[in-house]
Amino acid sequence: MARSRTAGRCNPFAFYRVPVTVFVTLIYVALLAPIIVVHHILPAVPESDVEGLDLHEAWRDLQHLTNGFHPYNSHKNDEVRSWLLTRIDEIVSTNVKDAKQQDGVRTFVFDDNQSNLTVVQSNLGVYFEGTNIIVYICGQEDDKREWWKEPGLSPSGKGGVLVNAHYDSVSTGYGATDDGVGVISCLQLIKYFTTPGHEPTRGLVVLLNNGEEDFLNGARVYSQHPISKLPHTFLNLEGAGAGGRATLFRSSDTEVTKFYQRSPYPFGSVFSDAGFKLGMIRSQTDYIVFEGDMGLRGLDVAFMEPRARYHTNQDDAKHTSQQSLWHMLSAAVATTEGLVSDTSHDFEGRPQGPGKVPSGTGSGAVWFDLFGTAFAVFEIHTLFALSVTLLIVGPLTLFITSIILANQDRMYLFGISVPVDDGFGSVPLRGWRGFFRFPFIFGSTTASVVALAYLMAKINPMIAHSSEYAVWSMMISAWVFVAWFLSRIANFARPSALHRIYVLTWMFLLTWVLLVITTVYENRDGIASGYFVIFYAFGTFMATWISYLELFSLPKKSDFANKVSGQISSRPTSLGGSRLLTPSGESVGQHPEDEEPTESTSLLRGQRTSFANYTRPVEDDGDGDLLSTGVSTDVSEARDFNVYGYEQPWSANLPKWTWILQFLLIAPIVIILIGQLGLLITSAIHQTMQDGSSTLVPYLIIALLTTFLFMPTLPFIHRYTYHIPTFLFLIFVATLVYNLVAFPFSGNNRTKLFFLQEVDLDTGANRVSLTGIQPFVSDAVASIPSADGQNISCIPKMDRTECSWESSLVPHVITHPGSEKEETPLNEWVKYKATRLEPGSQNSNRAQIKISGLNTRGCLLHFDKPITRFHVTGSAIDSRFPSNPSLEDGTEDGVREIRLWSRTWGNQWVVDAEWASDEDVNNEEDTLTGKATCLWSDANTQGAIPALDEVIQYSPDWVAITKLDAGLVKGSRSFEV
């Protein structure tokens, strides 16, 4: 029986325009809103302290730690180190009554002033003397001997846990989140695990390393301390942003990642881990030393936004929060507690290389959070197995279902017509209608947002720096409006009940191809960044299969054809009724006008005018029901109200509610995974363009994520009413205009310019440079008084532009400004002595260079041609860290620069160097030339570096000044030997 028109309009679950518009919109809003809230609103700090922790104390410690710049090469760094040793002593002495007593936790503090190391990497040599602070809290199952006191002795047992943070900052940042919060979290971990009742089962090593900011030196030199043999797992606490949530950057394996699952507020995605593996993220953390060089298995937890404050004077306590501190601290406590309580043998086994700890090998991990409260972790092998299964089962299931439908004569897809008996010809099915819609609509919508990405990169490439949500709004509104507009046009021109099944079939094909690609990466490279594709493909497969199963509810094609032919033969012939049939061969050439005229025949040929055969217009009421205007005709009487609009008549029996199930299978999980991933990626990259990264990539990523996020609407969007798309069109126009004309920076979203002052100590030449993105770096230089009237030289430097000028502002880095001491002559800032040595057994070109600098702990030697070998007197050598050029490390061309770091001020380094002979000259003329340079990085005293003070004072408020190199000031002298 035909459904009544009123019943159809009152069904809130039917596949009509109002239910589809309301339901789809509500699902998107209901899921995207909490995703955005979770991303930006941090968990509240507990009203009362957690046992073993003191959050008020932690916040006060952070404020004290960040009261000045404290890079390795600064006197403030020494003050911070002394303060940390004092705080650790206070914590340990308060919690540990006596290490000899039963009720005390055995704790040892190592003030490491002995470890040093030489490392060569990427044609750069580094010699570093460490000043790390190491706290060892003994575990219940640890070796009771003080084995570290005996050279060559190793600990017994299952291995311990390392928690690391670095206490040095950059020379232009206070280091609140890079890495102050990590350091304070370590202090609280010491407090927590030395509190009675919290004694660890495995030993806990807390490392506060010094010298991370320049080449990860502190972590590398930690490897030389005997206690480094104990830990098999680690947790690295880092800051690559300046606040917000601490995210799980990367992990070594599934087994160790499961302990992060204990965090009360987990946050992160394996996508970031893939970014490091694929080289998309160029900067590194101490994680690479512990996991790659030493063979530990662990986690990298770090702040990642906002990048505009990273390494600037806004990385301070004022611009972070207690909520950020609590977010990292709570994760650190939960994760560490799980690791030190583990009694399994999961982290024992063969070392991953010579000299590495015997931590065994774990399985690749897939992990992501859900709304910042739940955390999914499983093996990449599981993802691979599920992917392969879906790749096989999905197409096979649809193929078998299609065969069954064809055998039952219910395969309406691709059907053109069905022949009927009695000479009526064939009944059209119009089964191809809607087949080509998805490629056209999907291609057009995707092309539109990709075109917008290129437009932004061309006209206003930096707008995403401060207005990332305006870019998102523009992309989303454009995509949805174009998709709706094209779908409505297609549905108006050629209405089809097969729109949904065809679109879903195309979507399944697309996700199947994407799943093939991600499966290859999972198996070949261990990269799981496409984890969301399997959820996408599975939901799309299930929704597509439901559409195929819906076809079983339709009559057989032959029955439908016979029914149509029977209806037509049982009533007077009409023009409207005849259109349901395709003429047979016998009826070709027969026309109504060939019949015998009667009194009802129209005076105009081919047109009947009697009331009995009057054809009326039929209108759509907007809910899918058809309203007649006039007296019923043969056609309208035969029309089934279960048929939506002018779609195929045979679609009357299709279920009206299954679309909801299909949408719920596809959309929610896609919205959650893609929505969270989109915000995570946007936060990580939208402010990286100032560092010289591609200006196009962020916009392309947002465009593609928009496509993935809203593609689940394509099977249903042709049922949308015009209200929301029209509103989105207005949003698109407004955001497009804004994104094209708005200035991309502000006081809260500053662009970074990189400062360096270079002084030629031989000639007295003094040059200041700012490096950044054009035209903004030139605009900033124009505001500097000392640059006014100077010859500004702007040259490309990597992916940025360096603008430099001669400056009259001489740095006062040897004596404090206002000191009564006389200024030290420039040529005494750096002292060196280069002596040629007797030819060796393997090389005739050998020299010894001694270098020292006043009031500095960092110098370097730059060679005009590469050296093939060098050695710093007193340096340790470790096979895990190459100390000379080698083919395996890509440094076979030699070393061009050696950086020298000392824990003492004014130290003299002695470097022996060898270089290859030049075939064009004899040995006596084969000289080695270069520069002896020292670095000064202490900007805590006003007037010490007047050029820096001036740049900070007079730069526009949308500019942040940060350091370009290891030193803010570089003083150089030329040498030849």
UniProtKB/Swiss-Prot annotation:
Q: Which residues lie on this side of the membrane: Vacuolar?
A: 39-383, 460-469, 522-525, 681-696, 748-977
Q: What EC number(s) is this enzyme filed under?
A: 3.4.-.-
Q: Which residues bind Zn(2+) 2?
A: D178, E213, H311
Enzyme class label: hydrolase
GO-annotated biological processes: proteolysis
Where found, per UniProt?
Answer: Vacuole membrane
Molecular function as annotated in GO: metal ion binding; metalloexopeptidase activity
Q: Which residue positions hold the site described Transition state stabilizer?
A: Y310
Q: What is its main location?
A: membrane
User: InterPro entries recorded for this chain?
Assistant: Fxna-like_M28_dom, M28_fam, Peptidase_M28, PFF1_C, PFF1_TM
The record lists Zn(2+) 1 as bound by H166, D178, E238
What does the record note about the cofactor? Binds 2 Zn(2+) ions per subunit.
| Alphabetized UniProt keyword annotations | Glycoprotein, Hydrolase, Membrane, Metal-binding, Metalloprotease, Protease, Transmembrane, Transmembrane helix, Vacuole, Zinc
Chain segments annotated as transmembrane = 18-38, 384-404, 439-459, 470-490, 501-521, 526-546, 660-680, 697-717, 727-747
Q: Which residues are glycosylated?
A: N113, N116, N749, N791
Instruction: Report membrane topology.
Output: Multi-pass membrane protein
Q: Which Gene3D superfamilies match?
A: Zn peptidases
Region annotation Disordered: where it falls in the sequence: 566-604
For the Cytoplasmic compartment, the record's topological domain ranges are 1-17, 405-438, 491-500, 547-659, 718-726
| Cofactors named for this entry | Zn(2+)
Task: Give me the Gene Ontology terms describing cellular component.
Answer: vacuolar membrane
Family membership noted in the UniProt record: Belongs to the peptidase M28 family.
Name it: Vacuolar membrane protease
Q: What is the lineage of its organism?
A: Eukaryota, Fungi, Dikarya, Ascomycota, Pezizomycotina
